[in-house]
């Protein structure tokens, strides 16, 4: 299993699912608000907002919540105080990690992320210290039911994508960041709405993680995901399927 950006945890903990879902809805709405604030409130004229709305719909965020998040961007208030931050460092097993945040309190967020690194076997670095391990890409994800692998590949090529990967988890289509809006629109015409379309961090080099390190790494990533200000976590780990099956048994 290769590491990737994630809104959901790889290893789900029992209990607290309602709280987790409420937290996810808050993060999705916050991304919509900031996207609308930085660009146009019209998703057809704002690729980032359009991607944020698609991601929210895929997670069943109610339509009224989506509209309120857009309205918040144009009415000022709390939205004016939100800023984007990015932190980088290494987690257990020397895995490179990028943490993307939206916050109204830079000091609070920095403290939470720094604590997550320092107390869980990680080391936080300077900006750019691990980004060279990743490539910035546009990522469009479809479920398996969207079509057979060959059909999705053909649609991806026709849409101008750079790569199409199909697995039991679905279809991942990547493109240049500047092409995300055009490629996603072309794919929608052929395959329908994706589960999400967003800018992502694609690992250029993957770090194998042994069985002894996996639990610590998963705990660390889980703690980062649980931070209210963290929007997305990218990590360049690779875990053998046999190890994952053993740990999940």
UniProtKB/Swiss-Prot annotation:
The keyword Cytoplasm applies. One of its GO terms (biological process) is regulation of DNA-templated transcription. It holds the Pfam family TACO1_YebC_N. It comes from the Bacteria. One of its GO terms (molecular function) is DNA binding. Keywords: Cytoplasm, DNA-binding, Transcription, Transcription regulation. It is found in: Cytoplasm. One of its GO terms (cellular component) is cytosol. Coiled coil: none annotated. HAMAP family: Transcrip_reg_TACO1. Belongs to the TACO1 family. This is Probable transcriptional regulatory protein Rru_A1086. It comes from Rhodospirillum rubrum (strain ATCC 11170 / ATH 1.1.1 / DSM 467 / LMG 4362 / NCIMB 8255 / S1).
